[in-house]
């Protein structure tokens, strides 16, 4: 037989799960244990003491002969006579009188013991009558027959419920126990419950929860008591805060919403280092991540809720079933029973009267069991009422939001909501503390504290570098926010914030008086009102790199003193048909607009800044730019770059830009430039860059663009240079590198103002002597050609500072290179063996640049 502890273990759950057991579940668990005890007690009693005792019902005599009076002399007859009489009675006599014997043991013994001996003297008949004969009735059954009939009548005469009540009660109780805790055992729900309880316990014990709640208490108290200074209020609200000499807590803090009197700054900045150490901070940040993932995992289903409802319905149905059939058997349990086993051929009797010694005990236990199951059932009905009375698949933290400063705690749904409702039945404080870890404001505060603890002023100083413009630059990458110490770097010129989604710029940025350039790379920074006012007046250059237009902060379009704006991101996806630059008209001082995207047309909104825009750059990343009409309105643009726009011809809209000075059409598909004659109307055009295209020839009409000073045709398919190019007397820079040019015309000598000539990567084999008449040349790149000799007249280029000859077919260098006094070894790009062919004095002259810095430094 099993013990009570072994069966009761079915009702056991992990101690940590008790927070998910409301009072009715606990009460039903105890009732189940009581029912289990009743069932086991009844079963034990039945196995050890359950007996049925039966006696035959003897027939009554029908006449006086059939019955011998107790004092009759026939009673004293010998045993054989009595046996014969007994046999005679068994064969044919019937009677209506029923008598019960006093013994169920062997009938021979009482017969010999109860009848008087026949050798007594009978002198006095009266004395004999005073000594009564035994009144019991003889059955003449032996012991085995009684055992047999007791067993037969136990199974035939007793109601089945009297025999199986303990076992049925035990089975019903076990089913109820399993039903009560099935949601703790079923794998698909058990895993979620276990995870929830684990996270809930950690959130409850986390120091960050205590700190956050203390901050909330301080903030609420300060809002109600604005009359108290920080030195008086801080010891009252923050028992673990810093020393009494801390700054006043009533100092107003300016944020995005305006002025706010609170003890927030002392509570966050000073006590955070003592209340929340680095280890606790890391654990709290891990908890936020766990809560976020658990919410996403649990909120998408309601399996736990449905399973709890199903098991409650099963328990209720079980209660109704038990109550209905059990109540019918209460009256069926009785002490006396009549048994007709139909074994006359074995026993000689047809009817037996039986007694059940456990009847009264079983009846009382059954009534007790019914009473307990009724209480159990009423609790089940109450549970169903609770389940369907309120929407348990929705949980609102409205009360927590009202009591705390975390107004962003979201409402939850489905299984997450149901678990929180169950926890509320245990202790609502768990949900309140758990809600802190659902708040983004709380998480941001934690990140801010940890961030400021890690990124101190000294550490930020070590990360400052100087950029190409010799400005102090700080680059912060993938942080949880912007450390407060950044805004103490008052001499910083450039600030780069990359991949910081929660970046906030406080009013302290007004201390950075040297800050003029800001980079926001995938960083939709939020600014406070005071910070915005400072940026609006002082910021000159802004770089914004984004994936979606929504990442461009709205305040960017309101920086009235901004001079340069760089926008890099996708502006032509399915969600971004038009660039969101509606507010560019507020950028009254914008001079340079750089857009690197994938536009199909020039946004019309750019015309809002047309009156003062001087430079427009569009890098289109290979997307074909189809509509360029908006360019016609940009009359003041001096520099225009349309790179990688898949243009096949020079856009006609460009010819309307009368103030255009520099045009860059790099990396397009331009094959012909017959429209170049129209550039003669652009009187100020001095630089034309048509490099990295597919241009085959330069039309002679280029001679009409007389003001050109720089001409770039590198990386095209040119095979020759037209004479018209050399009629551009103002030309200072000519770049025809990486083409198929095989000859340099002798007319090149006409370019008396030429300073930079690039012919690298062509097929030139001979250098005309007229080339060296361009005595103003400073840069001459002739690498990767087929040149076999360098004319001695190269010595006429006295201003030459860079000469590239590498990759040719030269066998020596002329000694006249020594006459190029501005040329040094660092500016001479040539193979080492060719350099060694120079005379020693020439090599020494070229190497003087190595010693000059040392001489200057002494």
UniProtKB/Swiss-Prot annotation:
Polar residues bias spans: 227-251
Transmembrane segment boundaries: 23-48, 164-182, 309-328, 361-386
Pfam families in the cross-refs: LRR_8, Pannexin_like
LRR repeats: 514-534, 538-559, 561-582, 589-609, 612-632, 636-657, 659-680, 684-705, 707-728, 730-751, 753-774, 776-797, 799-820
Membrane topology term: Multi-pass membrane protein
Region called Disordered, residue ranges: 221-251
Keywords: Cell membrane, Disulfide bond, Endoplasmic reticulum, Ion channel, Ion transport, Leucine-rich repeat, Membrane, Phosphoprotein, Repeat, Transmembrane, Transmembrane helix, Transport
Residues exposed to the Extracellular side: 49-163, 329-360
A GO MF term: volume-sensitive anion channel activity
Reaction(s) catalysed (UniProt annotation): chloride(in) = chloride(out); iodide(out) = iodide(in); taurine(out) = taurine(in)
Modified residues (Phosphoserine): 241-242, 246
GO biological process, one term: cellular response to osmotic stress
Family: Belongs to the LRRC8 family.
Stated role: Non-essential component of the volume-regulated anion channel (VRAC, also named VSOAC channel), an anion channel required to maintain a constant cell volume in response to extracellular or intracellular osmotic changes. The VRAC channel conducts iodide better than chloride and can also conduct organic osmolytes like taurine. Plays a redundant role in the efflux of amino acids, such as aspartate, in response to osmotic stress. LRRC8A and LRRC8D are required for the uptake of the drug cisplatin.
Protein's UniProt name: Volume-regulated anion channel subunit LRRC8D
Lineage of origin: Eukaryota, Metazoa, Chordata, Craniata, Vertebrata
């Amino acid at each position: 037989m099993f013990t009570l502890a072994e069966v009761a273990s079915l009702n056991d759950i992990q101690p940590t799960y008790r927070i998910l057991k409301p009072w009715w579940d606990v009460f039903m668990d105890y009732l189940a244990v009581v029912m289990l005890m009743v069932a086991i007690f009844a079963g034990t009693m039945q196995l050890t003491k359950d007996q049925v005792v039966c006696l035959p019902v003897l027939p009554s005599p029908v006449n006086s002969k059939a019955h011998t009076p107790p004092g009759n002399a026939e009673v004293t007859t010998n045993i054989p006579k009595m046996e014969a009489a007994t046999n005679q009675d068994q064969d044919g006599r019937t009677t209506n009188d029923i008598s019960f014997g006093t013994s169920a043991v062997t009938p021979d013994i009482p017969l010999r013991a109860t009848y008087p001996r026949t050798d007594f003297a009978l002198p006095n008949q009266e004395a004999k009558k005073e000594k009564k004969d035994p009144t019991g009735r003889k059955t003449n059954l032996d012991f085995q027959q009684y055992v047999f009939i007791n067993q037969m009548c136990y199974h035939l005469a007793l109601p089945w419920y009297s025999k199986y009540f303990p076992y049925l009660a035990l089975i019903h109780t076990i089913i109820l126990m399993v039903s009560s805790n099935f949601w703790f055992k079923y794998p698909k729900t058990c895993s979620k419950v276990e995870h929830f309880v684990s996270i809930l316990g950690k959130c409850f014990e986390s120091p960050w929860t205590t700190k956050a709640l203390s901050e909330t208490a301080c903030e609420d108290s300060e809002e109600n008591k604005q009359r108290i200074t920080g030195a008086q209020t801080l010891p009252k609200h923050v028992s673990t805060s810093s020393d009494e000499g801390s700054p006043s807590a009533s100092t107003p803090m300016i944020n995005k919403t305006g002025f706010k009197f609170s003890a927030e700054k002392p509570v966050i900045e000073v006590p955070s280092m003592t209340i929340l150490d680095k280890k606790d901070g890391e654990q709290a940040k891990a908890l936020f991540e766990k809560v976020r993932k658990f919410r996403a995992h649990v909120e998408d289903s309601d399996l736990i809720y449905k399973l709890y409802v199903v098991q409650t319905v099963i328990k209720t149905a079980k209660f109704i079933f038990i109550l209905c059939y059990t109540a019918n058997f209460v009256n069926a349990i009785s002490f006396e029973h009549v048994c007709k086993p139909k074994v006359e051929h074995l026993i000689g009797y047809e009817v037996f009267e039986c007694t059940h010694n456990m009847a009264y005990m079983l009846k009382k236990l059954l009534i007790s069991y019914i009473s307990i199951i009724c209480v159990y059932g009423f609790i089940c009905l109450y549970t169903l009422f609770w389940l369907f009375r309120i929407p348990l698949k929705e949980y609102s933290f409205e009360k927590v939001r009202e009591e705390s400063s975390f107004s962003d705690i979201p409402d939850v749904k489905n299984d997450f909501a149901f678990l929180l409702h169950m926890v509320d039945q245990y202790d609502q404080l768990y949900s309140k503390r758990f809600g802190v870890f659902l708040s983004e404001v709380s998480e941001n505060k934690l990140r801010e504290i940890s961030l400021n603890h890690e990124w101190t002023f000294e550490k930020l100083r070590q990360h400052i570098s100087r950029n190409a413009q010799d400005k102090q630059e700080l680059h912060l990458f993938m942080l949880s926010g912007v450390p407060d110490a950044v805004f103490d770097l008052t001499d910083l010129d450039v600030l780069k914030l990359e991949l910081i989604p929660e970046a906030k710029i406080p009013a302290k940025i007004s201390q950075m008086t040297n800050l003029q350039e800001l980079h926001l790379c995938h960083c939709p920074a939020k600014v406070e009102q005071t910070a915005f006012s400072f940026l609006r007046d002082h910021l000159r250059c802004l770089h914004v790199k984004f994936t979606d237009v929504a990442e461009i902060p709205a305040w960017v379009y309101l920086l009235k003193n901004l001079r340069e704006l760089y926008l890099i991101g996708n502006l032509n996806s399915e969600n971004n048909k038009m660039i969101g630059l509606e507010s560019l008209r507020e950028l009254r001082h914008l001079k340079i607009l750089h857009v690197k995207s994938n536009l199909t047309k020039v946004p019309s909104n750019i015309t809002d800044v047309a009156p003062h825009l001087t430079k427009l750059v569009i890098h289109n990343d290979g997307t074909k730019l189809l509509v360029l009409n908006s360019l016609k309105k940009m009359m003041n643009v001096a520099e225009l770059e349309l790179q990688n726009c898949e243009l096949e011809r020079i856009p006609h809209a460009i010819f309307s830009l009368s103030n255009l000075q520099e045009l860059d059409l790099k990396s397009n598909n331009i094959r012909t430039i017959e429209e170049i004659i129209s550039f003669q109307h652009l009187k100020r055009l001095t630089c034309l860059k048509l490099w990295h295209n597919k241009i085959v020839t330069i039309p002679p009409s280029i001679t009409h663009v007389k003001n050109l000073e720089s001409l770039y045709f590198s990386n095209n398919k040119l095979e020759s240079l037209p004479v018209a190019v050399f009629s551009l007397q103002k030309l200072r820079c000519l770049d025809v590198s990486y083409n198929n040019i095989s000859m340099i015309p002798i007319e090149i000598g006409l370019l008396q103002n030429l300073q930079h000539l690039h012919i690298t990567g062509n097929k030139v084999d001979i250098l005309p002597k007229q080339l060296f008449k361009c005595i103003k040349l400073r840069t001459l790149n002739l690498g990767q050609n087929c040149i076999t000799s360098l004319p001695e007249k190269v010595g006429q280029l006295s201003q030459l500072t860079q000469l590239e000859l590498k990759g040719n077919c030269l066998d020596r260098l002329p000694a006249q290179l020594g006459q190029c006094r501005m040329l040094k070894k660092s500016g001479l790009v040539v193979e080492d063996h060719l350099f060694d062919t120079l005379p020693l004095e020439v090599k020494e002259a070229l190497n003087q640049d190595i010693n000059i810095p040392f001489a200057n430094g002494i």
